[in-house]
A protein has these predicted regions:
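Iron-sulfur-cluster electron-transfer modules
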Residues: 1-149, 156
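Alpha-helical transmembrane segments of polytopic membrane proteins
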Residues: 67-72, 166-172, 233-238
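Hydrophobic cores of alpha-helical transmembrane segments in multi-pass inner/ER membrane proteins
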Residues: 70-83, 174-179, 240-244
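Juxtamembrane/interface segments at transmembrane-helix termini
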Residues: 80-100, 181-196, 220-228, 244
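Alpha-helical transmembrane segments with an aromatic anchor "belt"
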Residues: 125-131, 160-170, 183-203
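Hydrophobic membrane-spanning alpha-helices of multi-pass integral membrane proteins
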Residues: 137-145, 169-181, 200-219, 236-242
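Membrane-helix exit/interface motif
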Residues: 146-157, 179-188
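Extracellular/periplasmic helix-loop-helix junctions in multi-pass membrane proteins
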Residues: 156-162, 217-240
Length: 244
């Protein structure tokens, strides 16, 4: 399944970057390092005032700047994904005429399968793999919603505790536990789905794990009231999260 996904992604990606990333570890690592260094340099030269007598996250990294960055990144990624999806549609459906109303009536099936991926349960007798993936996706989408849609409330300025942290704890627990389990499964190679792993398979899990870990570490030092530790962990967290 992973091999098929990589091949299809490389076929429909008009930029050619997917093919380069999948065929060259140097390209993948180079791109990640470039983006990470770019984030670090942005904060080195354009951060706000550094207040050390108390935690002041929004002074160091104004939430409006972060929100604009989130939206810009989401727009760029959406543009790439949608353009590739349109390209895939043209390749597959160019000679097939489908009534427009059928797209409307089948939209619910698309949404249902996107959210639940229920057809995965039909692959073999073991349902635990589907359940783990479903829980992982729920944690990932929860965290994405917090940092993109609700960043104004999720990014707390001082060392106080905010109720949105409850959702962050859920996402953190899910992402850490499931990624560690996936690491173990790929190392032991007991399941056929994890018997053969490419570099990109490992890389995504590593980035997801350390994005989650640095996020909860930043939260911990902020709650503890350590200003410099909070700012440093904030930059490290984004340097890992953005390349992912």
């Amino acid at each position: 399944m992973m091999a098929t996904r990589r091949w299809l992604t490389a076929q429909y990606d008009w930029t050619g970057l997917a093919r380069r990333f999948y065929l060259s570890e140097a390209w993948e690592i180079g791109a990640l390092i470039t983006v990470a260094l770019g984030i670090i340099l942005l904060f080195c030269f354009f951060h706000g005032p550094v207040i050390t007598d108390r935690v002041a996250v929004n002074t160091f990294a104004p939430v409006m700047w972060i929100e604009i960055g989130d939206l810009a990144m989401a727009a760029i990624l959406s543009a790439f994904l949608l353009s590739n999806a349109i390209r895939m549609y043209r390749f597959i459906m160019s000679d097939i005429k489908v009534p427009f109303w059928l797209y409307i009536t089948e939209a619910r099936a698309f949404v249902l399968n996107f959210i639940t991926q229920k057809r995965w349960r039909q692959c073999g007798d073991d349902r635990s793999r589907w359940l783990k993936h479903f829980i992982l996706v729920s944690g990932y989408l929860t965290m994405m919603s917090l940092v993109i849609v609700f960043i104004r409330w999720f990014q707390v300025d001082d060392s106080s505790w905010h109720f949105t942290s409850i959702f962050g704890y859920y996402a953190t627990g899910v992402l850490l536990v499931i990624t560690v389990e996936m690491f173990r499964s790929r190392l032991k190679k007991e399941e056929s789905i994890h018997r053969y792993s490419e570099f990109s398979d490992w890389l995504f899990l590593i980035l997801l794990f350390f994005t989650t870990l640095t996020g909860i570490m930043m939260h911990a030092v902020r709650i503890a009231g350590w200003p410099m530790g909070t700012y440093v962990m904030y930059v490290i967290h984004l340097a890992v999260a953005v390349p992912m």
